[in-house]
Amino acid sequence: MSMRCLLVDDSARFLEAARALLERGGMQVVGVASTGAEAVSRVHDLVPDVVLVDLDLDGENGFDVALRIAGDTTAVILISTHALEDFQELVAASPARGFLHKSALSAGAIRELLGRED
């Protein structure tokens, strides 16, 4: 069974491109959200395996969103166009399973970060 993914970003263009990229890589994108509140609701309704959360949502902090949605069955990966070095301590202190630069985003990179092969 393919990994179920929720994308959280305030850029409609990025959401569209990321969905296409991940689906080509065999992931099932079950939904998208552009705000923290939408993300919380979608996680509750869709129960994805992994949620990709942009660090810089419009007026919201991706770290705060990660705190609200991380759970036993849902892994969170933080994403950004900024380098990990800019946020390394915050990422390490967050409930997120890791960080991916948006330019490195792929189904394979997500599977590797989560230690999954499906």
Locations of the language-model features?
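Conserved sequence signature across two-component system core domains
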Residues: 8-9, 33, 51
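Two-component/phosphorelay signaling modules centered on CheY-like receiver
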Residues: 12-31
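The feature encodes the CheY-like receiver
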Residues: 32, 58
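Acidic catalytic/metal-coordinating carboxylates
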Residues: 35-38, 61-64
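Active-site residues of response regulator receiver
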Residues: 54
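As written
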Residues: 62, 91-98
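Hydrophobic/aromatic residues positioned on beta-strands within the core alpha/beta folds
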Residues: 79-80, 102
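C-terminal output helix
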Residues: 86, 103-114, 118
